[in-house]
Amino acid sequence: MAKGTRGKPSVIRPSYDDDSGSDGELANVLQARDEPSDGDDDDMDSISFGALNAAQRKLDQKASKKKGGKAQRRRSDGDRDNSDDSDGDSDGSEEEGDFFETSDDNDQGYNKGKSSGRNPRKQVQKKKSKHAPSESSSKRPVSKVRDIGGLESKSMYRDIRFDPAYGKANLDEVRKNYSFLDDYRQQEVQEMEQVLKKDRNLSHFNKQKLEFKVQSLKSRLDTLNNRDLENKILSEHKKEQLAKFKSGSQANPYFLKKSDKRKLIQKAKFDNMKTSQREKVMERKRKRRLGKEFKELEFNRH
């Protein structure tokens, strides 16, 4: 040192070394804090953020021992972030932001965690009331296959004889194989009609229920019989046309149109009806015809 020069404390240059290499700087900083001098402001400007951060961590550790470890839990999360920012690879701006971070935010976060008693992320939200709808996270995707409320559940058992996956069912063959069920249906209708006649102690509700079942079974039997009659008429016509074609009396077989099929079926049904049924059908047709005529008259007046 030259003569006449004033003695100055050693200047600490800014550096971004690891915490292990900043022990000497830490000792100088602590010593400089206790010994005031004229160049304190200049020295503080030249101290690295890593050294200041390490010094702050040392002071916090000492304070936590006196307060029973409460301050250590409060600043544990902030210390982890600050230790990462003090590495040599981190930027100076990031270190400065972490260093000047206020302790109010940490205190608020600590109070929130202390009041809840557990991690708020893991805490399950409770329903406001038992009648409130259940809540689910919107971040979890909804499954593609799910049950819809109000619809009937799928049957657990399936009859492969009527399963469309095994091909289209032959209704004529099914009707032929299960035609014996008509006898059971007819017998059931007769038994329910006898109950309605003999049992007079039936309630109004049970009586209406039995009448509805009788009417439903009768209409089902009529539908099956009409379908059998239609199939029978069409098959007989087809056989007749093929016989004429084979005998040579007809050049080509004649295939009926839908309108011709409808007329042929109606004629066959009318022939097989009883007298009372025919009268009802004729009366229904007459009323329908009169209604059409009245509508035409009203339209012509306007």
UniProtKB/Swiss-Prot annotation:
<comment type="subunit">
    <text>Associates with 90S and pre-40S pre-ribosomal particles.</text>
</comment>
<feature type="coiled-coil region">
    <location>
        <begin position="206"/>
        <end position="228"/>
    </location>
</feature>
<keyword id="KW-0175">Coiled coil</keyword>
<dbReference type="GO" id="GO:0032040">
    <property type="term" value="C:small-subunit processome"/>
</dbReference>
<feature type="compositionally biased region" description="Basic residues">
    <location>
        <begin position="119"/>
        <end position="131"/>
    </location>
</feature>
<keyword id="KW-0539">Nucleus</keyword>
<dbReference type="GO" id="GO:0030686">
    <property type="term" value="C:90S preribosome"/>
</dbReference>
<keyword id="KW-0687">Ribonucleoprotein</keyword>
<comment type="function">
    <text>Component of the 90S pre-ribosome involved in the maturation of rRNAs. Required for early cleavages of the pre-RNAs in the 40S ribosomal subunit maturation pathway.</text>
</comment>
<protein>
    <recommendedName>
        <fullName>rRNA biogenesis protein RRP36</fullName>
    </recommendedName>
</protein>
<dbReference type="Pfam" id="PF06102">
    <property type="entry name" value="RRP36"/>
</dbReference>
<keyword id="KW-0698">rRNA processing</keyword>
<dbReference type="InterPro" id="IPR009292">
    <property type="entry name" value="RRP36"/>
</dbReference>
<comment type="similarity">
    <text>Belongs to the RRP36 family.</text>
</comment>
<feature type="compositionally biased region" description="Basic residues">
    <location>
        <begin position="64"/>
        <end position="73"/>
    </location>
</feature>
<feature type="compositionally biased region" description="Basic and acidic residues">
    <location>
        <begin position="144"/>
        <end position="154"/>
    </location>
</feature>
<feature type="compositionally biased region" description="Acidic residues">
    <location>
        <begin position="84"/>
        <end position="107"/>
    </location>
</feature>
<dbReference type="GO" id="GO:0000462">
    <property type="term" value="P:maturation of SSU-rRNA from tricistronic rRNA transcript (SSU-rRNA, 5.8S rRNA, LSU-rRNA)"/>
</dbReference>
<dbReference type="GO" id="GO:0005730">
    <property type="term" value="C:nucleolus"/>
</dbReference>
<feature type="region of interest" description="Disordered">
    <location>
        <begin position="1"/>
        <end position="154"/>
    </location>
</feature>
<feature type="compositionally biased region" description="Basic and acidic residues">
    <location>
        <begin position="74"/>
        <end position="83"/>
    </location>
</feature>
<feature type="coiled-coil region">
    <location>
        <begin position="277"/>
        <end position="298"/>
    </location>
</feature>
<keyword id="KW-0690">Ribosome biogenesis</keyword>
